[in-house]
Regions:
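Compact mixed alphabeta submodule
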Residues: 130-266
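OB-fold ssDNA-binding interfaces and closely related basic DNA-contact patches used
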Residues: 1-170, 229-233
Length: 267
């Protein structure tokens, strides 16, 4: 473009048009997984739904996928939101750094490790029995992302603590149990303590209806596929950007879980 052409052109309109086009492109790229069901609280701050956990799909062994990740904001203002390589049993730069902070013996370092600790999530297929906030979800199969508290209730149903309780596989179509998800807000956080399983019962009275549900389930292996994780070096680069390169602390000897676990890591 010559100077004369530049003078005649309406650069403002061009810039605005380009910016709008770019924003539209970015909006199209933003991804919302429509397969995921999410609970919603009512005006009182409570949530309620009845779900049925579903068994593993054909070709997979487990009815859940287990995923560790990190989500924290660094001093730069940037966020580090990444899946942790510890999910795959590999070394991860944030876990190594957190271990170094924890082992320093300095309380302020431990506080940093707590803020940066990895978080545990599970994914399972569910059938929505009842959802008063969104009745259009009832009778449909979704993926459900949940944490350790709900997983503990699943394990308690399979491994009851008392002699008068019968073990139940909540993922079984015929001998499983509906899960009454009850959410309250306690100290600003969602609390699931009131949630419980109903008495065991078949999902449906006929196998044809059960098979229709089974065919609609989603594979879970994708959540722990290697393609779902960045490499160690990529994560390290991102971590340095978020923390502005201010995080060299000692040698690494342990991994962080919900609380520190004294297990040796080879670096």
């Amino acid at each position: 473009m010559s100077l004369a052409q530049m003078k005649k052109s309406n650069s403002l309109d061009q810039l605005l048009g380009a910016a709008q086009s770019e924003n539209q492109s970015q909006e199209k790229k933003s991804y919302k997984d429509e397969r995921l069901w999410k609970p919603e609280l009512d005006k009182t701050g409570n949530g309620y739904a009845v779900l049925r956990f579903l068994p593993a799909v054909e070709g997979e062994n487990m009815p859940w996928a287990k995923l560790w990740n990190h989500a924290f904001q660094g001093p730069t203002g940037q966020w580090y939101i990444e899946n942790s390589l510890t999910t795959l049993g590999n070394n991860d730069p944030v876990s190594e750094m957190n271990s170094a902070y924890w082992n320093s013996g300095v309380e302020s370092d431990k506080e940093i490790a707590r803020k940066q600790k990895r978080k545990l999530q599970y994914y399972s297929n569910i059938y929505v029995v009842s959802d008063s906030r969104h009745p259009e979800h009832e009778g449909k199969v979704f993926l459900f992302r949940y944490g350790k508290k709900i997983f503990d209730k699943i394990m308690e149903s399979m491994q009851p603590a008392f002699e008068d309780e019968t073990a139940v596989n909540p993922f079984d179509f015929w001998k499983g149990a509906n899960f009454k998800l009850k959410i309250r807000k306690v100290d600003g956080y969602w609390n699931y303590d009131k949630s419980e399983f109903e008495a065991p019962s078949a999902l449906f009275d006929n196998d044809e209806a059960i098979e229709e549900v089974w065919k609609k389930q989603y594979a879970l292996n994708e959540f722990t596929a290697t393609t779902n994780f960045k490499s160690y070096d990529e994560l390290k680069t991102r971590l340095n950007m978020v923390l502005a390169g201010t995080t060299t602390v000692g040698n690494v000897t342990t991994l962080m879980e919900d609380e520190p676990v004294l297990s040796t890591v080879t670096v």
